A protein has these predicted regions:
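Alpha-helical packing segments of well-folded alpha/beta enzyme cores
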Residues: 9-12, 16, 20, 58, ...
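Acidic/histidine-rich alpha-helical segments that form the ligand environment
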Residues: 78-117, 131-136, 146
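Alpha-helical bundle segments that constitute or directly flank the non-heme di-iron/ferroxidase center
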Residues: 2-30, 53-64
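Surface-exposed helix-capping loop/turn segments at secondary-structure junctions
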Residues: 25-33, 109-117, 153-156
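Solvent-exposed alpha-helix faces
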Residues: 18, 25, 51-52, 102, ...
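Short, contiguous alpha-helical
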Residues: 33-76, 119-170
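Amphipathic, non-membrane alpha-helical segments in soluble helical-bundle scaffolds
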Residues: 3-13, 40, 87-94, 130-133
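Short acidic/polar alpha-helix capping motifs at helix-coil junctions
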Residues: 9-12, 24-26, 68-69, 81-82, ...
Length: 170
């Protein structure tokens, strides 16, 4: 891929809005709070994580790279407890994420004559705006995979003694 592929990346981010919407739809409060194991995140925590990443990480860092400026420090791994993701309302959390994604797509599609090679630098590393954009999409895929795995594990738990081996290897 090269910087001419930004439309493809942005279109995939827009497409993933629908993927996330469908994954998050129809989840009961019990299901939304269920964790696949001790120390693992629930659906509620994942949706709040990707909501904050949407606004405070990826969108902000693409902007910072395009403007050749620093971006505020972030600590996404700590946010789950610091921001009490588990204590939030699931339906509102999903709506907030989808709204932030809509803002991101509108903003990304409004960009014209952009130097996607513009860099964001901090003491740990540097990355181009294009690099952040591609990683944004990769981050979507990481969490789509995570949520699909959580769906499978939830089904496995609820299925009890029924073997899921016929479905294929996980």
């Amino acid at each position: 891929m090269d910087i001419n592929d930004t439309k493809f990346i942005i279109d995939r981010l827009a497409h993933n809005t629908g993927v996330f919407r469908e994954i998050f739809t129809g989840i009961s409060p019990e299901y939304a709070s269920w964790r696949p194991a001790e120390g693992k995140w629930s659906f509620l925590e994942v949706v709040n994580h990707i909501r904050d990443e949407e606004e405070l990480d990826f969108r902000e860092r693409v902007k910072a790279a395009l403007e050749n400026r620093e971006a505020p420090a972030i600590h996404p791994g700590k946010w789950v407890t610091e921001k009490n993701y588990a204590g939030r309302d699931y339906i509102s959390s999903v709506a907030n994420f989808l709204l932030e994604r809509e803002h991101s797509i509108e903003w990304l599609r409004s960009l014209k004559d952009i130097d996607w090679n513009s860099k964001w630098t901090n003491p740990q590393f540097e990355m181009t705006a294009y690099g952040f954009l591609v990683n944004w999409l990769a981050h979507d895929y990481l969490h789509i995979r995570q949520l699909n795995r959580m769906n499978f594990l939830y089904l496995k738990e609820k299925a009890g003694d029924v073997s899921l081996q016929y479905a294929g290897d996980w």
